[in-house]
Each structure stands twice: as C-alpha cells, then as structure tokens.
Amino acid sequence: MVKDGAVVDRGVNLAAEYCERLDLAILVSGLGLEVAALVFDMVASGKALHIWSMGDLLHDAIAFLKVCLLDGIVPLLDMDAECELAQVIFNTGLPLHNRLRTLLESALAATNSVPAITAQHALCEEDIVPLVYASMSVMFCSTTLLSNGVDSNLFESIRRSSQALLRSVFELHADQRTWILEEILASLVKLPAQKRAQSVHRVAGGKSV
C-alpha cells in the first residue's frame, strides 16, 4: 500500500508539473498570437509601410499563427477525451480552462485579421501555404474536448474565420486552387460521414457538405 501510495503521489506531482508547463506554454502562445494580430492589423491599415522589415515580420506572424493552430490548439482539442493526457489537462480546475479560452480568443483575433491582408497584398507562396494548412486544420478539427469546459461557440467562430481566410486565399490566388482543392478532398475522405438527406452529408462533428 505504501508503494502504491507513492506511485499515486508521484503521478499527481507529474500531472501538476505538466499542467504548469502547459499553462506557461499557453500563456506564451497567447501573447504571440496577440503580437501576430497586431502585425496583421498594421499591415492591413498601411501603418507599417515605413518599417523596412515588415515583410519579415508578416512572414513570421503567419508562420506563428500556423504553428499555434496546426501544432498546438488543434491537436489539443482533437485528443480523445478518454485518454490519460486529456484527463490530466482538463481535470486540473478552472484556471487552465480560462487560459485556454484566452488562447482561443487570441487565435480568433489573429485569424480575423488575415483576410484583409490577403485582399490588399500579394502574398508569396511561402506565406500562402501555411495559411491554407492552418485554416484547414481548424476546419477539420473534431473538437472532442470542447465539452470539457472550453467554449465551443468560441471555437466555432475560429472555424468560420478560418473558412473566410481560406476562401479569400482561394479566390485571389488562382494558381493555388488545384492543390487546395486536393487537400480539402483528402481531408474530407478521412472523416466519418453519415448521409442525412439527398446530397447532404454530415462530417467533422456535424458539419454539412
């Protein structure tokens, strides 16, 4: 019993340490997204024209948005709710949930700012590709963990914003349309679908196509 008790205590300590690190990572990511949104707004408004390195800043902001969505937020929300890691993360109390909500709010602000840039500036392929994959990762996220306390309406707003972003890229960059369509179709065929009505299927947790 003493040994088992020690194992339990060690597990609790490891879980607490992991959540502390996750909390810090979420905080830093949220701050980075706020900076990215600021860069997007400055570029869209023309206030950044006098900054000689703004092209590099814009590229870095787009890359950061892609990493946060594709490699951070989406994998976190796509985890199986029954897995041990998910239980460790989402059973630590309200503070972490609040931090996640703040991160999602920052992601929404950043994604909302990008379409204005794509409409006004000719982005290079190096920037278009990460924007497309960032948008698609959100659109096809199953969000199985949103029922554990993270605001599902907030993430749905991010999903709609990502769709608008992808639509703007698709409309303005004809030379990129073929591979974008191929990636969308490849993502669709991986999702479970249930036919509800003629020519209408439900995929990705209830999304209609």
Residue ranges and their predicted role:
Residues 1-209:
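Eukaryotic alpha-helical solenoid repeat scaffolds
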